[in-house]
Amino acid sequence: MKRKLLMLTALALCLALLCGCTTIATSEWMQNLFPVGDEAVAAQQTGSVNGSEDKQEVKQVVTETYTALESFGLAYQPDYGLQPYNCQSLNNRIIFSFLYEPLFAVTSSYEAEPILAESYFVTDDGRTTTVKLRSGVTFHDGSALTAADAAYSIESAAGSEYYGSRLRFITSAEAQDDLTLVLSTSEAYECLPLLLDIPIIKSGTKDEVSPPGTGPYEFAETKLTRCENWWRDTAPLVDFDEIALTVSSTAADVRDNFEYQKVNMVL
């Protein structure tokens, strides 16, 4: 039952990842996934059936208690790679939540929450959005995050099949200075920050096996290792020195590794 609950929770994460969400979405599901101490979970939902207005109550109660994990593992499908803008493996996209962070994340109330960004301003005509980045943010290699990196990431994402549709109205992404990004759109787009929950990578690295990000972990072939110089002064929500990556080439491999508890989340 516990592992079914983990899978259901992972599916919730999947929906966020498909939209590009990372940090805030990750925060919400992680808090539910890793409770402190023994805990039982009960959930109740009310919804319509077959589109009708009649609502039926659906109850699901998990009676098993469990404790926090002593180790953590993820499924890894190496054939799909870890390029955040083109990777089509949903399991690999879970890994991105540990490697990368966005300019903004979308909250449960559908508001843009600054992550790597500090603030933003939209002109009266809605066609220019200026984003001010946080200072002191660094990539895994120790280099500082700049507006040029953010512009490169947005341009790379806009040219990809995965993110191209959502970013199609952006006509230019330019660094005004080291911490100021200016985005122009072909039409009024006052809510553009809601679409900027995409992974930010270091400029010029999109074709690398695992482009440097700003997240709490970095890729090390068979595992993720904690970034010792992570720019935040708080511990990550998934707080392990290492996260094992178990090669799972096929859907059957993913299923088996999950059932045998080699990995803790699958999609």
What residue ranges belong to the model's regions?
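Bacterial lipoprotein signal-peptidase II cleavage site
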Residues: 22-30
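Short, well-ordered beta-strand elements
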Residues: 60-78, 128-131, 150-153, 181-183, ...
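N-terminal lobe/hinge region of extracytoplasmic solute-binding protein
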Residues: 73-124, 155
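Surface-exposed ligand-recognition segments of extracellular binding domains, strongest
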Residues: 110-138, 168-205
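Aromatic- and charge-enriched surface segment that lines or borders ligand/interaction sites
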Residues: 118-161, 259
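Extracellular/periplasmic solute-recognition and catalytic clefts
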Residues: 157, 220-223, 246-267
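Gly/Pro-rich hinge or "lid" segments in bacterial periplasmic/extracellular proteins
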Residues: 184, 189-244, 249-252
